[in-house]
Every structure is written in C-alpha cells, then in structure tokens.
C-alpha cells in the first residue's frame, strides 16, 4: 500500500498531523487525479479519491469540523477528482452536523449526477441525513424511489420513522420485513421507548426473545432501550419485567458494559431498590466510566439519600474521574433536596473554574430550585436575572413551584405571567397559579385562571390510580 495511504489510516485522530499531511499532498500534487510521477509509487485512478475520502472521514471524527469535510469535497471537485460510493456517506454525516441542510441537498444532487442513487451505502446515508435534519418527507421520498430496497435501506427508513414518532408507519414497515435483523428490532423497540409507549417496547422485546433465531448474545442497544422502558413504566409489574431482563442478560453472558450497568442502576433506582443498584454499581465502578457513577449518585439522591449521593460524588472526584454536565445536574439536585444552599452554590461555581464544565440551562434551573426550596425566592429571582441567556420555561417553572410551596403570591404572580408568555398552552401552569391564588384567598384571580383554562380548550390531565389484589388490578 502506498505511503500516503498508510499515513492517512494512522492519522485519523491527529488533526494537526492531518493538516500537515494535507499540505504535503497539495504541494506534491498527489491530491490530483494524475499525480506527478517519480516521487512515490501510487495507484492511478481511485487513489486521489481514496486520499480525499480518508481526509473527509478523519475530519468528520472531530465533531467541530463538519465544515472542513465539506470544504475538502469542494476542493476534490475543483481538482477534477471523481467521488465514489465511499465519499458520500461521510459527506452526508458532515452535512447533517452543519448549521444548514442546504449542503446536504447539494451533495444529494451530486450523488444523482454521479449515478450513485442505487448504491446501498449512498442511499442509506441519504435517508439518514434527511431524518437527522428533520425532513421525514424527503427521507420517505428517497426510500420510496428505490426499486428494490435492501435490508440496510429499510433499517435506515425504519430508524427515521421511529426517530420522528411515526410509530404506525414504522410498525407497518417492520412487519413487512421478512428478513428483519437485530438492528430492525432495536430501532422499533427504541422508537416505542423514546416516544413514551413503554409497555409496547417491553412487549416487542419479549416477542423478540421468543424467536427461534434469536442471537445467542443480546444487542446492548436493545437492552438499554427496554431497560429504559421498564424504568419509566408506571406499572406494578415493571420491576418484575426489569428483573426478567436482567436475568436474560446474565443467562446469555452478555458483558456488563458501562452503558448497560447505567441502564440497570437507573431502572432499579426508579423502583426504589437501592440494594440492586449498589450491586450493579460495584460490578461496573472499576470500569472508570463517568456514566455509571452519575447513575448511582442519581439513584441515591432520588431515593432520599442525598447526603450519601454527595459523599459518592466526593469519592468520584477523589478517584480521578472528571465529572461532566450530567454529574453536576445530579449533584445540584441532591443539594437542593437537602437544602444545602452554600454547598450547592459552591459546586455550581466550581463547574467552570475547577472542572471546565460550562453551565447549561439545566444547571441554572437546578440552582433556582436549590434557592427556591430553601425559601430564598428573591435570590432565585435575581439569579435568573443574572443568567447569561434568557431563562426558559423549566427555569421559571422551578421558581413557580417554590412560590407555591412557600405560598408567596407576590413572586408567584410575576413568575406566572412570565411563564404564560413562554408556554400559554400548558394546562398545569394555570392550575398551579389557581392554587397559589386560592391559597392566598385571592378568589377572583383563582377564578380567572380557571376560566382562562376553560376558554383555552386545554384540559386538566386526568388523575388515576389502581389497587392490586393478587394478580388483578
């Protein structure tokens, strides 16, 4: 294999070296379709395209460089290098990460011009691109124009339908796939789970394991999805289903990866079984992955063990693991539950100064919740005013909840008006405001909120409960 080809394969993860190699390619002329002879032995024809394809893929691996990949493609065309079936998949991924989808449409046009629309790689990438940029119509059109879509193309379309919540169409496509594989099942199960139909996700998983040709080792992504469904299903049998899946994992000797351990900890914690959480955490903590620590810290905080959660966070940082955005959401939530205002504010400040984590909207919302729970409503209001960006409804909602708890109608009035401007269609908001006004004896205002809710056409979410007697609900 030529020297440059070897270098390109080995320098994927070193952007500075790649730029240097790119400069060498340009100065020596080896990026051209017909490079100069006598310098290095090189295959003619496809070699220049190979170089560009490698450079495009390497830049794509660095998510902050989609524009570099697109510029390389423009340079490739300018120098008369003909793109091939391996060029377009990487380009379309870069286009999906770009600010505007227009570059992806231009790449689509280039694929048409090059006669690559019937190529499996290119077609799957086009469907995936349109799904990523939210254009399900174009994804469908691209798929429907295939004379004989293969399994990979159908899996791409199935994934696109699931991502955009069109589960009826996804199920219809899935049922028509006589050659569906684990990827097909995973897409559908994940689609139902992420769209809130947790029961159906579990039913589909049970249907999958009943097949005769079920793979000997389960798919990790599928297991994570179905465990997420068990975690979020509000049903008395959800825990037993989760235990069954855990047993399935053990019986099939599936490796307990960090992601799978995180899903198990989350599932057990949401059903109040901290003992199981601890067992799974102990089995995965040595892997040195932040997500399992985050899950265990969250499990402790969620189950009223906020002090233990903060101790575990200390142990995490002492062990050398660097916390991420999720870690600080969990830690700030634990501080809020314990009303540890000073400690929570200290951790919030240390996010950027000590750990290099830039606070996001979620973190600001956690601080507002921290101050609000402790009764510092004015401080919470002032804190919102100092935010570097406009507070969204989740931040104002945290303050409104605190106003309700502390029966502070003065702040609740102003915060409520702010929230109505942001989310005028949210029925729960009107109900909270009505309760705040009623608690303060402002019956006219309470009636006004009730009337506004009725006139808007929104409906109060219906409450429900069940009683379990034996095996009956």
Protein language model annotation of sequence segments:
Residues 1-150, 159-181, 187-473:
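Terminal (and in a subset, N-terminal) low-complexity or junction segments at the ends
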């Amino acid at each position: 294999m030529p020297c440059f080809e070897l270098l390109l394969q080995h320098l994927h993860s070193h952007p500075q070296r790649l730029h240097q190699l790119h400069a060498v390619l340009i100065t020596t002329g080896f990026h051209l379709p017909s490079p100069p002879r006598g310098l290095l032995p090189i295959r003619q024809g496809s070699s220049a395209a190979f170089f560009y394809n490698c450079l495009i893929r390497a830049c794509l691996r660095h998510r902050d460089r989609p524009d570099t990949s697109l510029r390389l493609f423009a340079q490739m065309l300018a120098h008369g290098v003909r793109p091939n079936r391996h060029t377009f998949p990487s380009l379309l991924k870069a286009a999906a990460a770009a600010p505007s989808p227009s570059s992806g449409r231009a790449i689509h046009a280039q694929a048409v011009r090059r006669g690559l629309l019937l190529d499996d790689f290119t077609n799957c990438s086009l469907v995936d691109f349109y799904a990523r940029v939210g254009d399900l119509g174009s994804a469908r059109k691209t798929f429907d124009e295939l004379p004989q879509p293969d399994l990979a193309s159908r899996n791409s379309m199935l994934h696109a339908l699931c991502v955009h919540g069109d589960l009826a169409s996804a199920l219809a496509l899935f049922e028509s796939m006589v050659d569906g594989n684990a990827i097909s099942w995973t897409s559908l199960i994940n689609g139902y789970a992420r769209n809130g139909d947790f029961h159906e996700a579990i039913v589909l998983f049970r249907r999958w394991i009943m097949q005769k040709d079920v793979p000997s080792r389960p798919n990790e992504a599928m297991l994570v999805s179905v465990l997420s469904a068990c975690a979020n299903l509000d049903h008395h049998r959800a825990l037993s289903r989760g235990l069954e899946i855990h047993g399935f994992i053990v019986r099939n000797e599936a490796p307990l990866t960090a992601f799978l351990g995180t899903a198990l900890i989350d599932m057990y914690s949401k059903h109040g079984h901290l003992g199981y959480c601890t067992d799974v955490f102990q089995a995965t903590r040595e892997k040195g992955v932040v997500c399992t620590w985050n899950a265990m810290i969250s499990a402790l905080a969620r189950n009223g063990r906020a002090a233990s959660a903060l101790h575990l966070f200390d142990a995490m940082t002492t062990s050398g693991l660097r916390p991420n955005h999720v870690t600080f959401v969990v830690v700030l939530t634990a501080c809020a539950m314990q009303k540890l205002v000073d400690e929570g504010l200290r951790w919030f400040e240390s996010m950027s100064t000590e750990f290099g984590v830039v606070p996001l909207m979620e973190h600001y919302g956690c601080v507002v919740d921290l101050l609000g729970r402790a009764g510092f409503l004015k401080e919470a209001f002032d804190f919102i005013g100092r935010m570097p960006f406009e507070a969204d409804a989740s931040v104002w909602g945290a303050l409104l909840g605190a106003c309700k708890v502390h029966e502070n109608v003065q702040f609740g009035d102003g915060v409520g008006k702010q929230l109505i401007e942001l989310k005028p269609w949210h029925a729960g908001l009107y109900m909270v405001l009505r309760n705040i006004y009623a608690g303060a004896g402002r019956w006219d205002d309470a009636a006004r909120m009730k009337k506004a809710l009725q006139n808007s056409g929104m409906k109060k979410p219906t409450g429900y409960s069940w009683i379990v007697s034996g095996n009956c609900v």
